[in-house]
Amino acid sequence: MAHKKGASSTRNGRDSNAQYLGVKRFGGQSVNAGEIIVRQRGTHFHPGLNMGRGKDDTLFALAAGVVEFGTRRGRRVVNIQTAE
């Protein structure tokens, strides 16, 4: 049995890129329309008032206002309270 695998063969080199997921704007912070609030895999947080959801489940603001986290029907939701 060879104890070397031969020319240009390796068992390493499989590191994946970071995904940079998580909450980007926290409760009480001011945001503008279009700003990303949460990057996530699946719907850990659900979109609430003045919030949109992208195809990769990213939550973003549809209007300028203040971020607010809460619950609705047992689900974590994110709302944007606009200054009306």
Curated annotation (Swiss-Prot):
Keywords attached to this entry: Ribonucleoprotein, Ribosomal protein
GO CC list: cytosolic large ribosomal subunit
Keyword check for Repressor: no
MF terms in GO: structural constituent of ribosome
Domain of life: Bacteria
InterPro entries: Ribosomal_bL27, Ribosomal_bL27_CS
Record's keyword annotation contains Ribosomal protein: yes
Annotated GO biological process: translation
Family the entry assigns: Belongs to the bacterial ribosomal protein bL27 family.
HAMAP family: Ribosomal_bL27
Protein name as annotated: Large ribosomal subunit protein bL27
Source organism (scientific name): Kocuria rhizophila (strain ATCC 9341 / DSM 348 / NBRC 103217 / DC2201)
Taxon lineage: Bacteria, Bacillati, Actinomycetota, Actinomycetes, Micrococcales
